[in-house]
Amino acid sequence: MRLKRALLWSFVLATPMALPQIAVAESAVDMEEVIVTSRRKNESVQDVPLSVTVFGEEKIKQLKPATLRDFDGLAPNVYIGMNAAGPGNSTIYIRGVGYPGSEKTQSPQVAVIVDDVQMGSSTGALIDVFDVESIEINRGPQGVLFGRNTIGGNIVVNRVKPKFNEFGVNAAVSVGDYSARTIKARINIPLIDDTLALKIGAISREQDGFWDNATIGGEQGDIDFASQTIALRWAPNDDFDAILTYDRIDDNSEITPQDSLHDGDNRFVTFADKETPTSYEVDQLSLRMNWDINENMTLTSITASNSGEDDTESDFDGVFIGSTNFPIVQLHPKRPQEFDYFSQELRLAGAITDTLDFMVGYSYFDSELDYVQFTNNIIQLPAAFLGLPAGVPCAAVPGLGLRANPVIGDAFCQFPNDKSTQFAGEDVESTAFFGSLTWRPTEDLEFLAGVRRIDEEKDGRNRYVNHSTGTFDAPGQDPHDFTGAPQVPGTSYTVSDDWQDTITTASANWAFADNARAYVSYSEGFRSGGFSIRSVNAATAPYEPEEAEQIEIGLKSNWLEGALTFNLAYYQLEREGGQFISIITLPAGAIPGTNTIVNNGGTAESDGWELETAWNINENFSMLFNAGTIDVDNGAFTLPCDVIDGCGADPSGTIRNLGGGSDSRQPDKSYSMTLAYTRQVGPGILSANTGYKKVGDFLLVNTGAGPNNRLFEGDYGLWDAQIGYDLELKSGDRLNFSLYGKNLSDTEYKEQALFLGGPNAGFQGWGAPRIWAFEVTYSR
């Protein structure tokens, strides 16, 4: 690693010597300056010494995204997908680092930050982007300035602020495929000139599901989402500005059906034998205050409180009871949860001298989670596994209460329903002190150094109750109604631990020409340790923090008199104690059917290149192009089966060698390109754009329970397009008409998959098919 860093420094020093010799051609179309907040202050994206992609309000309008998920692949080495285990659940990876799960007790590796408030978990992170003025995707560890759980990077969302002295309306109505209908509105109301303004917004989005259920009939995957926001902005003088925001979210969408890994070729036909309703209700209150103490110093306070509950019913087996899947042929959990988050951050930033800036801060985070899971599962095994000769019925096995598979017969034997309730929870308290210094010895040279001290404590609790009766449920029986069932106490434990860490960052940034600068940066990240909430015993619950360090070199440049930007970066990332999930099937009769543990794997090293270009070709045409590569080596680690009562069919004492090779969602290459066209036509402006993104082969899932628990996804490409007409009315108001389509080639691709303790049981989730929509937008 040291040799590689030495080579990187040599590259940085050598690069500027060649670049100024490149001729700069003329162009009539300048590139508009883009402002980012990647270092907790407003700066031009071309001046920031790190890899960041930013989408401004106009670009967001052009892309026609519904949620954050629609930004998948639009920045180098960035994957944004869904997770079907919960409402609005995100699976976000940057540079091959991310979290594929859904538990609120295991922190994501990529943080989503909305108006300076970090979301507490991946639930609900695929936010609607109607009321958004910019989205910044920062790649690489961001731990010093943004805190824990940002070792892959972060996505910073800045929403539209209330405006003084200006009444405004922005509303959109759209209809589309699968009975899609969306209504969005935002109103800005000035209350007191230059002092008080109010913003009110609301969203309603509905759509029928893409999936037909061949077992129970009907459609699945419906969308039913609503949200409201109210923001009050107060500025009593030129030195103080405060925004108080209230948000309410009600999401009653169905999760994406858990389609079996073995269901056949039609990706939108599922054989699951259970509906999968969800509910997600959240109330959030935040207060952001800025006080310019003097012309050289600003104090910022961000306070946020988030309280909510969600409930998800799943069919994790993805099949009907007569399937050949084993060892699990039925796994039906219901997971109601209640959660509360509170966070407070204080930052003091300013200038010590004309060449020396500083920032110091304090961060506090507190959360409480109460979790209940009702589980109803059936274990199924081939009769041969039980030693039954051909022709001998399953019921002949004494003392187990077996029955034959209802469809296939005695070739597969099923154990009676295992029923359980789990009561669990976790309390978290995390504090941090951080600071940075920025020194500019000359106008063209800048150095930054920063440090963060993290102190975190977690308390976990878990208790199981067994409701099994040794019998099978009657057809049509509610799988989660345990009224009158036995109440046999199972495993019960409490756990507690704390962790401390100090992480650092440093960068050097050199504007070696009027149109170009080179930089080198070093950054570290910290991902919280904790306790697996789905662990069945105290021995397998704990896992340690994950740490990351990265070195990056980059070039940022403007050409053709500002019409072309060309940015190039190379990074090396090393992770210690990477957290990998293993799902282990438990023996028949053991509740809740599976044991989920979090392993701290070996060292994982990766490196890659990233290219970003934007070119205003002329007054009418523009182009965006980005590309990324990932070369990764994940160290192997072992899973001692004796501490988890055996790994499925393996006896206690078995040691499984896991890890090595690729982890999930680490394609070796990916790229995207967007072409846009605008022209005055009649009284309005005609616009059109088309985009294509390509993803290379990658490992979609590795559940860490054995070499067969891997599923690879082949390379695929997605094509989107949009055409619109923008008309200014006599009143000065504007109307925009837009027709757009996504995945126009109807490409088949998987967004997620999960093995349930073995290669013959598990589910997969497919990406959306080709869809179109027509939207009308009014603004004044």
Residue ranges and their predicted role:
Residues 68, 91-93, 113, 137, ...:
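N-terminal periplasmic accessory domains that precede
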Residues 102-103, 110, 115-141:
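Short acidic/polar hinge/loop motifs at secondary-structure boundaries
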Residues 168, 175-207, 211-254, 280-287, ...:
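Transmembrane beta-barrel wall of Gram-negative outer-membrane proteins
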Residues 211-219, 256-273, 315-334, 374-423, ...:
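Solvent-exposed loop segments that connect transmembrane elements
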Residues 288-316, 511-527, 542-638:
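Membrane-embedded beta-barrel scaffold of Gram-negative outer-membrane proteins
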Residues 336-361, 367, 551, 661-780:
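Conserved C-terminal beta-signal and adjacent last beta-strands/turns
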Residues 358-359, 443-447, 567, 572-574, ...:
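Gram-negative outer-membrane beta-barrel transporters
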